[in-house]
Amino acid sequence: MSELLLPPEHRYAKIIKEKLNEDGSELSILNLGPTHPATHGIFQNILLMDGERIVDAEPTIGYIHRAFEKIAENRPFYQITPLTDRMNYCSSPINNMAWWMTLEKLLDIEVPKRAQYLRVIVMELARITDHIICNSILGVDTGAYTGFLYVFQFREKIYEIYEEICGARLTTNMGRIGGFERDWSPKAFQLLNTFLEEFPIAWKEFENLFERNRIFIDRTVNVGAISAEKAMAYGFTGPNLRAAGIDYDVRVAEPYSSYEDFEFIIPVGKSGDTYDRFCVRNAEVWESLSIIRQALAKMPEGNVYHAEVPDYYLPPKEDVYHNMESLIYHFKIVMGEVPVPVAEIYHAVEGGNGELGFYLTTDGSRTPYRLHFRRPCFIYYQAYPEMIKGALLSDAIVILSSLNVIAGELDA
């Protein structure tokens, strides 16, 4: 019998017997993951199946748990940034900027306007990357591989822009307290302008491939739907909440990094199903492109970095090599020898897949007393078992893909 696949103490061993006693149906257990290629990460779901229909599901969280929050309690503030890269690595610059803004809020630091605009551009590029990956992979999971080939090359072009800005591609460790370590080169702006010219053509073709595709529509409409009330109750944010009809966006509700200077629409859906989540992300890509163009048009002159308060701002690298005072400050800041205020703060940004927040408690020492990452993927995965109950096994893969659950962010 299928209950032999589980230890006797597992709740499914009891559920199977109860279900058999209720209606006499033949139930089985299916392990989806943790290494199944369709899950796009180290996920496991123990599914209780009635034929091809999912009766119940139990997710297992923590396969790549790396104890980021505990590690952060033993690291100086500047050394926490690489941890943020490795959560949602599809849009790591957003994680970086969110962490710097949390520290700037703690230290009451005003960032130069030019640096704020450059941050907006970087974060919107990261959002586009995130949505390219999510929606193109959703196409692959429904059997439509062509769209993936149309747009995935542009992720590489965005990585080339990252590489020109900071030297890294995926885990960027970009920026610093107070702005950027250096102004962007002319080549970075050239690469950005080329991207803005070429990418919209490919993205329009991508939309046409899917939004008018009968097979794709049949696989996604009314699949994995969640109501606005349930989405709010679970704590959904980002595209998954907006697809359910709630027009909440952190960039508008609590503007940061001068987002109030830009005009953009918040796309919303109606039914909260897989198709709505796909369409909301498609529309958000167009809004991100608009924001980037506005930022370039309004780009102010000036510094990208506040260097006049050396206690918290890393000095320019060329000064570190030739100036003793700069070397001392560089060492003190990186090693965490600069005191910080005793405080308790929360700062959130609109990440690629929802509200990404840092809840920081300090005691005046060189490391955080406590740091909690608000990870949107962790919240979505709590709702996933309910969303796939009654669905077909093939739909479970599509629903997971549409939620854009990233294993690195889920487990942290």
From Swiss-Prot:
Family that this chain belongs to: Belongs to the complex I 49 kDa subunit family.
Annotated compartments: Cell inner membrane
Taxonomic superkingdom: Bacteria
GO cellular component term of the entry, any: plasma membrane
Membrane topology annotation: Peripheral membrane protein
Keywords: Cell inner membrane, Cell membrane, Membrane, NAD, Quinone, Translocase, Transport
Any one GO molecular function term: NAD binding
PANTHER family in the cross-refs: NADH DEHYDROGENASE [UBIQUINONE] IRON-SULFUR PROTEIN 2, MITOCHONDRIAL, NADH-UBIQUINONE OXIDOREDUCTASE 49 KDA SUBUNIT
Enzyme class: translocase
Catalytic activity line of the entry: a quinone + NADH + 5 H(+)(in) = a quinol + NAD(+) + 4 H(+)(out)
Function of the protein: NDH-1 shuttles electrons from NADH, via FMN and iron-sulfur (Fe-S) centers, to quinones in the respiratory chain. The immediate electron acceptor for the enzyme in this species is believed to be a menaquinone. Couples the redox reaction to proton translocation (for every two electrons transferred, four hydrogen ions are translocated across the cytoplasmic membrane), and thus conserves the redox energy in a proton gradient.
The organism of origin for this protein: Flavobacterium psychrophilum (strain ATCC 49511 / DSM 21280 / CIP 103535 / JIP02/86)
InterPro entries: NADH_Q_OxRdtase_suD, NADH_UbQ_OxRdtase_49kDa_CS, NDH1_su_D/H, NiFe-Hase_large
Pfam families according to UniProt: Complex1_49kDa
Subunit-structure text: NDH-1 is composed of 14 different subunits. Subunits NuoB, C, D, E, F, and G constitute the peripheral sector of the complex.
Main location: membrane
EC number(s) on file: 7.1.1.-
Gene: nuoD
Protein name according to UniProt: NADH-quinone oxidoreductase subunit D
